[in-house]
Amino acid sequence: MSAAHNPLRPPMTRPTGRFLLAHPAHAIALGFGSGLSPKAAGTVGTLWAWAAFLALQPWMSEARWGLLLLISLPLGWWACSVTARHLQAADPRCIVWDEVIAFWLVLWLLMPTGWPEQLLAFGLFRYFDAAKPGPVRWADRLYHDMDPSHTRHGWAKAGWGILVDDLVAAFCTLLLMALWRTF
């Protein structure tokens, strides 16, 4: 049994570059390193998502973005589930793939738009993700009141729990952006 799976060993407090490279799921879940930030990993992961979106934009059509998001959701669920299990934590702060998928969704549905709207969307998304008002708090609590450590099925549920609140934060961001655009 490896140290990452040993229930007698305390959970890792903060992953390292070695942990990131130890499994493909870790690299994905940790946002290809952006989740290793010692402070504000969610914000750093969202900034990485924004930069990656802009870098990929010249080669992506609407259909390609849709396909990438459809692939990224189950891939992200798997990566988040595996990484959370290896870290022995239901929703480690270093896992930022949830921010990546959710902010890509926001940008995909907002584009084309200029820097001011992208910046506003970034700020709103970070607010909803960090403060977890109303519906985001509800989504966060759906899965986080459980102890996933006993079963593999529990870790699979933890993976969805990591993703769901960020998707609700993306929806709230898009709703406010739509209201802002109408006025």
Question: Can you describe what each PLM-predicted range is?
Answer:
Residues S2-A89, R93-I95, V100-F183:
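Hydrophobic alpha-helical transmembrane segments
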